[in-house]
């Protein structure tokens, strides 16, 4: 009997040690910032060391960029063949942007990731067709979704971070593959903890219906007593909560970053960030529906998920654990061609003015050097 007690005690002790070592404990002190009336739970809780480490880790790998070239010159459309979208850039501007794309998306493969090196004009590689469509998506985001991206804007690097395919996103789930049969019952697409929804038992794929599709996210009524048609079933409510958990994890924030703890559903007392997040959700819906999902038909099998479709975009694709992607750092400063369709090239007057200023500065520097000698 004593041996059995010792064995049970040893097992419990080992489990306790394992829990203490693997439960993700954080060392105090923890910062808490009050964001609303005191005593209402309106507070943001963060581990300042982990938050700073996460930010510095992302900043450390941002590729260096050089100022855009200035001065007049022939356009890319005049010199190169099959330049469908950036033909009004000068050759220097065009190549400057192309080098950035290489650094952002294919630093190992180089130009060969999208181009046939013996015929750069060819559209034979699917990656070139995809990249052209992604440029149009980049323009749409920066032109039409200022309420979400602001002046920081986005570039290819915002999502790709040096990878051919962005590290984060989602595939449409195959519910049948995880569904029970017979006495095992039906899983209803949940109760299988997934990192995308914070390892909860909530539905692991709230994305297909809510940010690829256009199902209503709201499941809370606007009146005290229910009126009219039901707003959301229990399953739809769990799906919405799964999406909210995903947003919290993607930005590394609490619920009160957007919502007022007194009444989560009311807009009047919500924080300004809730407005930005609403535009962000609508933006992601458009990006998935109009740009990302349609490209699935030209992707090779190795790029497909369990349902035969390509990977889609969610909040983590850009944010990666920060309230603002890359801590709010803008990577578009030296690449005005990515700001929108109407900004693909600076005016010729500006080219000449900048070139003249540059030449004058160079001449002045040479004269100074001559005087010093």
What are these model-derived regions, one by one?
Residues 1-113, 118-373:
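N-terminal export/targeting leaders of redox proteins
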